[in-house]
Amino acid sequence: MKIIRKNKKDKERREIYKQAEKMKNMYKMLRRNELLDQETRNYFNMKVTSSEKNSSISRIKNRCVETGRSRGIISAYRISRLRFREYMKMGLISGVKKISY
């Protein structure tokens, strides 16, 4: 299967976020700690603000793992609504069927 460039980029961002998350949360906690002096809190504030852009969770975009489409993603399956519909019609997704009245 062909690797989609946007999915590769998104995967890299997820890895960067995963690595930086613990340290960033620790710095955030320490900068809010009122028991520390202001200079120390400013230091931790600087550490949080100077962190890499891609280490932010807001840079992560949900994408279809097959097509790379960024809109209309069914979160539980991580595929686009178009692929979901295709797979549903073929019966590849168990427990899901088309609604009829």
From Swiss-Prot:
Superkingdom of source? Eukaryota
Q: What is its main location?
A: mitochondrion
Q: Name one GO biological process term.
A: translation
Which GO MF terms are attached to this record?
structural constituent of ribosome
Q: Which Gene3D superfamilies match?
A: 1.10.287.1480
InterPro entries noted in UniProt: Ribosomal_uS14 (IPR001209)
Q: Among the entry's GO cellular component annotations, what is one?
A: mitochondrial small ribosomal subunit
Q: Name one Pfam family in it.
A: Ribosomal_S14
Which segments does the entry list as coiled coil? Answer: none
As for subcellular location, the record says:
Mitochondrion
UniProtKB keywords: Mitochondrion, Ribonucleoprotein, Ribosomal protein
What is the annotated quaternary arrangement, including any partners? Component of the mitochondrial ribosome small subunit (28S) which comprises a 12S rRNA and about 30 distinct proteins. Interacts with LIAT1.
Q: Entry's PANTHER family?
A: 30S RIBOSOMAL PROTEIN S14 (PTHR19836), SMALL RIBOSOMAL SUBUNIT PROTEIN US14M (PTHR19836:SF19)
The family annotation for this protein states: Belongs to the universal ribosomal protein uS14 family.
UniProt name for this protein: Small ribosomal subunit protein uS14m
